């Protein structure tokens, strides 16, 4: 597939521009591509849906997913200033789909695979419980200026809800997307894949772990250890050097 997105390691429009990325799927983590579900060559879906995630709008056009056609070309115009009149939902949902898949493929290399309780519809015979791809809800209308990730035990679909904050669309803030996906990882790994409720107490490390994932996947070659790295600068509108959610 081809996806016009803010690609890894670009954290948000504050730090880079969109690029049309060709075939970014990893052959080890997603052996039949991002739009497969049956484990055979050829895509089952030509929308932003596949084995690892289904990205769709959950605002005023609930359930809508953009269409990439037979060539799986998801190349849509964007207005980075969100408004009800111009939501740029095709571009936003495409970015959300890309990042959910990229995160899946990266962490797969580090051991968050089927047997460890990762998020896939079809586990391709590699253990664990399937039927639990991520439902990634773009421009979700149930909240603002935030995001969340609900993670049941292995075999249950996680739900990622990405919100709008005024004129800023959280679906373009890749650091926030990664942070939320990180909650899914830590919820599945702490206590075991079937016991996803072990991080509900106040004294737990889930928020810090999720921030780490966001920092790791958006690090640039010139970054240095002492550098301040704020989280969520696009969503909150604080600017690239603003304090934002955390620094």
Please give the residue ranges for each predicted region.
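Extracellular zinc-dependent metalloprotease catalytic-domain scaffold
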Residues: 1-247
């Amino acid at each position: 597939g081809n996806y016009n997105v803010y690609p890894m390691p670009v954290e948000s429009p504050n730090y880079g521009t969109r690029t049309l990325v060709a075939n970014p799927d990893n052959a080890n983590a997603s052996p039949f591509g991002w739009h497969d579900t049956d484990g055979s060559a050829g895509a089952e879906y030509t929308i932003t849906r596949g084995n690892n995630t289904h990205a769709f709008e959950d605002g005023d056009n609930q359930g809508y997913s953009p269409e990439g056609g037979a060539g799986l070309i998801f190349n849509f115009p964007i207005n980075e200033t969100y408004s009800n009149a111009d939501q740029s939902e095709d571009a936003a949902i495409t970015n959300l789909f890309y990042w959910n898949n990229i995160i899946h493929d990266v962490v797969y290399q580090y051991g968050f695979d089927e047997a460890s309780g990762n998020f896939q519809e079809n586990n391709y015979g590699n253990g664990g419980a399937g039927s639990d791809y991520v439902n990634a809800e773009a421009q979700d209308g149930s909240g603002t200026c935030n995001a969340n990730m609900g993670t049941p035990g292995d075999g249950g679909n996680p739900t990622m809800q990405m919100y709008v904050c005024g004129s800023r669309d959280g679906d373009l803030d890749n650091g926030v997307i990664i942070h939320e996906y990180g909650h899914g990882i830590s919820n599945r790994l702490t206590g075991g894949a079937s016991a996803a409720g072990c991080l509900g107490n106040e004294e737990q490390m889930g928020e810090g772990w999720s921030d780490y994932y966001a920092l790791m996947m958006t690090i640039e070659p010139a970054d240095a250890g002492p550098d301040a790295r704020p989280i969520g600068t696009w969503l909150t509108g604080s600017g690239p050097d603003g304090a934002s959610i955390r620094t």
